Design a protein with these regions (language model features):
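…primarily DNA-binding HTH/wHTH and HhH modules…
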Residues: 1-8, 74, 98-135
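Basic/polar phosphate-binding segments, predominantly the helix-turn-helix DNA-binding elements
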Residues: 1-6, 16, 28-64, 85-107
Length: 135
C-alpha cells in the first residue's frame, strides 16, 4: 500500500514539473530548480523523473521544446527560424537546426516548407484533408 501511495506522490510531482516546464519553455532550466518544484533532492528527482517518463530530463525538455517549435514553424510563419530558436531557449539557430534535424530527420526550414505545401494542397483537394488531419 505504501508503495502505491509513493508512486501516486511521484506521479503528482512529475506532472507538476511537466506543467512547470510547459509554462516556461522559453527559459533555461536548472536541475535544482525543477527538483525544488517536485519537492525532492536533485538526485532523487532525476532518478524518479527518468523512471516515470522513460526519458532523461534533458531528452524530455528537448522533445517538448521541439514539438512546440514544430507547431510554431507551421502556425507562426511570421516568425523566422532564428526567432523560434531563441524563443524556445536555444543558444542560436544552428544549435536549434541541428537538434531539430536529429529529432525529425529534416531541417526546420524543410519541415516548414513541407507542411505549408501539404496544407495548401489539402485546401485545394478537400478529399485529402481527412487523410492529412490523421497524420
Amino acid at each position: 500500500m505504501k508503495s502505491a501511495q509513493s508512486h501516486k506522490r511521484y506521479l503528482r510531482s512529475i506532472h507538476k514539473v511537466q506543467d512547470y516546464i510547459e509554462e516556461n519553455l522559453h527559459t533555461p532550466f536548472v536541475l535544482s530548480e525543477l527538483a525544488e518544484v517536485a519537492g525532492f533532492s536533485k538526485y532523487h528527482f532525476h532518478r524518479i523523473f527518468s523512471s516515470i517518463t522513460n526519458e532523461t530530463l534533458l531528452q524530455y525538455i528537448n522533445r517538448i521544446k521541439l514539438e512546440r517549435a514544430a507547431a510554431f514553424l507551421i502556425y507562426r510563419t511570421e516568425l523566422s527560424i532564428t526567432d523560434i530558436a531563441y524563443f524556445f531557449g536555444f543558444s542560436d539557430s544552428a544549435v536549434f537546426s541541428r537538434t531539430f534535424k536529429n529529432h525529425y530527420f529534416i531541417s526546420p526550414k524543410e519541415y516548414r516548407n513541407q507542411k505549408i505545401k501539404l496544407a495548401r494542397f489539402a485546401k485545394t483537394h478537400p478529399i485529402y484533408w481527412c487523410i492529412i488531419k490523421i497524420q
